[in-house]
A protein has these predicted regions:
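Soluble extracytoplasmic domains of inner/organellar membrane proteins
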Residues: 90, 96, 102-221
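Aromatic-capped interface at the extracytoplasmic side
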Residues: 11, 15, 44-61
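Short Lys/Arg-rich amphipathic alpha-helical segments
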Residues: 32-35, 50, 74, 107, ...
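Short extracytoplasmic
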Residues: 62-98
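Alpha-helical membrane and juxtamembrane elements of multi-pass inner-membrane transport
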Residues: 15, 19-22, 61, 80, ...
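N-terminal positive-inside, membrane-proximal cytosolic segments immediately preceding the first
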Residues: 2-38
Length: 221
């Protein structure tokens, strides 16, 4: 039963992740060039620097799109290879963060929780984007839940620094509490998640089901 609880907790949303990635791409895709380079290299050298950074951005975007396409096609090895290229050549950009998230996703699918945790920790600790760090922490909690480290999963899911993930964090905390057989606490966490969730969200049905499941078990004890 505990294993089923953990699997239930994992079903949070590769779709949500994909939507966030695509939203990020739409907003930032062609804007990752050095707009402050003039102050560094001077006006005379700016055109050469601009061409260099634009070429790097275009190259990174090509690899990024390739990685997404491979992932959608289920080509795990190729998606991982593309992610490794981004990590190696573009680590200092948000492409590197997204590549680590992809590596973690693929590793989790294969049950390689150690590598998934390593990739997520890189983003959580080193990303310059708070939203990326918050997402990585959230996913790291879920991977620890799957790996059976409920104490660490609980620690990661318990934070005030949730950014825009106001529903996701209490939901994952509820999943952890459910696996710990703390059913009334899980219900409270799921209720907080539901309160923060947009009324029309596609996640509402699953979240409500988990809340009702925790409540029914607690009532029968």
């Amino acid at each position: 039963m505990a294993e089923n609880d953990k699997l239930l907790g994992l079903h949070v949303a590769e779709d949500d992740d994909a939507q966030r990635v695509r939203a990020w791409w739409k907003k930032n895709g062609m804007g990752i060039v050095a707009g402050v380079a003039i102050g560094v290299v001077g006006v005379g050298g700016f055109k050469g620097w601009q061409a260099y950074t634009e070429n790097r951005a275009l190259s990174a975007s090509d690899v990024f799109q390739e990685m997404l396409a491979y992932d959608e096609a289920g080509a795990i090895d190729q998606a991982r290879d593309s992610a490794q290229v981004l990590v190696k050549d573009y680590r200092a950009t948000s492409y590197g963060d997204l590549a680590y998230l992809m590596i973690a996703k693929l590793a989790t699918k294969e049950g390689d929780f150690s590598n998934a945790m390593e990739a997520l920790t890189q983003v959580m600790q080193k990303s310059k984007d708070p939203a990326m760090s918050q997402l990585a922490r959230l996913r790291l909690s879920q991977v620890n839940l799957l790996a059976g480290d409920l104490v660490r999963a609980h620690e990661l899911a318990t934070t005030d620094d949730v950014g825009g993930f106001k529903s996701e964090y209490p939901e994952v905390l509820g999943d952890v509490l459910l696996a710990q057989h703390k059913y009334s606490d899980a219900v409270e966490a799921y209720d907080r998640a539901l309160e923060a969730l947009a009324p029309a969200s596609s996640s509402r049905a699953l979240l409500t089901s988990k809340r009702n499941y925790a409540r029914s078990i607690g009532n029968n004890q």
